[in-house]
Curated annotation (Swiss-Prot):
Top enzyme class: transferase
Pfam families named in the record: SQS_PSY
Cofactor(s) essential for the protein: ATP; Mn(2+); Mg(2+)
Alphabetized UniProt keyword annotations: Carotenoid biosynthesis, Magnesium, Manganese, Metal-binding, Plasmid, Transferase
Its EC number(s): 2.5.1.-
Name recorded for this polypeptide: Phytoene synthase
Listed InterPro entries: Isoprenoid_synthase_dom_sf (IPR008949), Squ/phyt_synthse (IPR002060), Squalene/phytoene_synthase_CS (IPR019845), Trans_IPPS_bact-type (IPR044843), Trans_IPPS_HH (IPR033904)
Taxonomic path: Bacteria, Thermotogati, Deinococcota, Deinococci, Thermales
Coiled-coil region: none
Known pathway: Carotenoid biosynthesis; phytoene biosynthesis
SUPFAM superfamilies assigned: Terpenoid synthases
Gene from which the chain derives: crtB
Listed GO biological process terms: carotenoid biosynthetic process
Length: 289
């Protein structure tokens, strides 16, 4: 069903959100076919504005609830803001699970207060809530079924875990410690060590452990590319760029308390041929013949 002209989203407004917050995502999205590209823009804008409702200027509980009201309006087919219209447009075309947004909201609620995660299981749950859910939203747009959705969740978790490993120092400034407390204790690391910027042997061992977990999730997630009908190169490029941050982090000796690992523009560009190769010849799941 075609949306009334008054309900058609202002795609330029949504693009401004993308370009302001993630030029990398925008460039990758250009590898989608036209309609799927618009769907990716709409979903990204909705998710990004939820994140901004927590961390952006004026962010907080009230802003988050206002964002959530917008999600609900989009699902009821009564959007108001441009991003809501974009999401409603996507919902007319793909079966994007409401539950994924519900779980994302739970992750954003965690971010509102001081963050302390007790276990690795809690960390992975959080990674699912704020990023694995994006995989669930994107899988239908990319033409995937349940297997693709499950793999997309793994990829989202891998990318969020990469974010967490990259941003330990920045997150501390917001009183957020996503590194599981049980793993900190097991490696002889105190939160005060993090605040003091002490990159100890125990801390490096902890980082290496979580880096290994992230790499395993990338392997599981990238094996889902073969289940997608469109957008393989776009998704592969995003994953390879994030995985490249892990390489930078390792090369720095896991010194992420005072600096932030990132890829330069030319390094991201070099990954484009690899993304097309992964799209053409998707990695096989571990254990497959």
């Amino acid at each position: 069903m075609k949306m009334p002209a008054s309900m058609e989203p202002d795609w330029k407004a949504l693009l401004r959100v993308l370009r302001a917050h993630s030029a990398t995502f925008y460039l990758g999205s250009l590898l989608f076919p036209k309609e799927a590209r618009k769907g990716a823009w709409a979903v990204y804008a909705a998710c990004r504005l939820g994140d901004e409702a927590v961390d952006g200027e004026g962010g907080g509980p009230e802003a988050l609830e206002a964002w959530w009201a917008g999600v609900e309006r989009a699902y009821r087919g009564r959007p108001l803001a441009e991003w809501e219209k974009g999401l409603a447009w996507a919902l007319e075309r793909w079966d994007i699970p409401f539950e994924a947004f519900l779980h994302m909201r739970e992750g954003f609620l965690t971010d509102l207060g001081p963050v302390r995660l007790g276990t690795e299981a809690e960390l992975l749950r959080y990674c699912y809530q704020v990023a694995g859910t994006v995989g669930r939203m994107m899988a239908p747009i990319a033409g995937g079924g349940k297997e693709a959705e499950a793999r997309a969740v793994k990829l989202g978790q891998a990318m969020q875990l990469t974010n967490i490993l990259r941003d330990v120092g920045e997150d501390l400034e917001r009183d957020r410690v996503y590194l599981p407390l049980d793993l900190l204790r097991a490696h002889g690391v105190e939160v005060e060590d993090l605040r003091a910027g002490r990159v100890t042997p125990g801390y490096r061992a902890l980082m290496a452990h979580l880096e290994g977990k992230a790499r395993a999730l990338y392997r599981e997630g990238l094996a889902g590319l073969g289940h997608l009908k469109v957008g393989r190169a776009a998704i592969a490029l995003a994953a390879l760029q994030y995985r490249g941050i892990l390489d930078k982090l390792r090369l720095s000796g896991y010194d992420n308390l005072g600096r932030r690992a990132h890829l330069k523009a030319w390094e991201r560009a070099l990954l484009l041929p690899k993304a097309f190769l992964a799209a053409r010849f998707p990695p096989r799941p571990e254990g497959s013949p």
